C-alpha cells in the first residue's frame, strides 16, 4: 500500500512532462494543413476530369 501514493504521483507527472519532437524539423517539412489542402485539390481535379460529383462517389468510374 505504500507504493500506491508514489504510483499516483508518477501518473500525474507523466502528462505534465514537456513534449519533445522525435525528429527535428527540416526545411522540407510541410504543415499538415497544407498537406490536406493539396490532397483536396488533387481529388477535386480528379473529379473534374472524370466528370464525377464529390457528393456521390459511386458515380465515379475508375479505370
UniProtKB/Swiss-Prot annotation:
GO terms for cellular component: extracellular region. The keyword rRNA-binding does not apply. Keywords: Amidation, Cleavage on pair of basic residues, Disulfide bond, Neurotoxin, Secreted, Signal, Toxin. Its main location: secreted. It holds the Pfam family Chi-conotoxin. Disulfide bonds join 52-59, 53-60. Residues 1-19 form the signal peptide. The modification Leucine amide is found at residue 62. One of its GO terms (molecular function) is toxin activity. Residues 20-50 form a propeptide. It comes from the Eukaryota. It is found in: Secreted. Expressed by the venom duct. The cysteine framework is V (CC-CC). Belongs to the conotoxin T superfamily. In vivo, low levels of the peptide injected into male specimens of the Siamese fighting fish causes an immediate aggressive display in this fish in response to their reflection when placed in a mirrored aquarium; High levels of the peptide suppressed this behavior. No effect is observed when injected into mice. This is Conotoxin p5a. It comes from Conus purpurascens. The lineage of its organism: Eukaryota, Metazoa, Spiralia, Lophotrochozoa, Mollusca.
Amino acid at each position: 500500500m505504500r507504493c500506491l501514493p508514489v504510483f499516483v504521483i508518477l501518473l500525474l507527472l507523466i502528462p505534465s512532462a514537456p513534449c519533445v519532437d522525435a525528429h527535428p524539423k527540416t526545411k522540407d517539412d510541410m504543415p499538415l494543413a497544407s498537406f490536406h489542402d493539396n490532397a483536396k485539390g488533387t481529388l477535386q481535379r480528379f473529379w473534374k476530369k472524370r466528370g464525377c460529383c464529390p457528393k456521390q462517389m459511386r458515380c465515379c468510374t475508375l479505370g
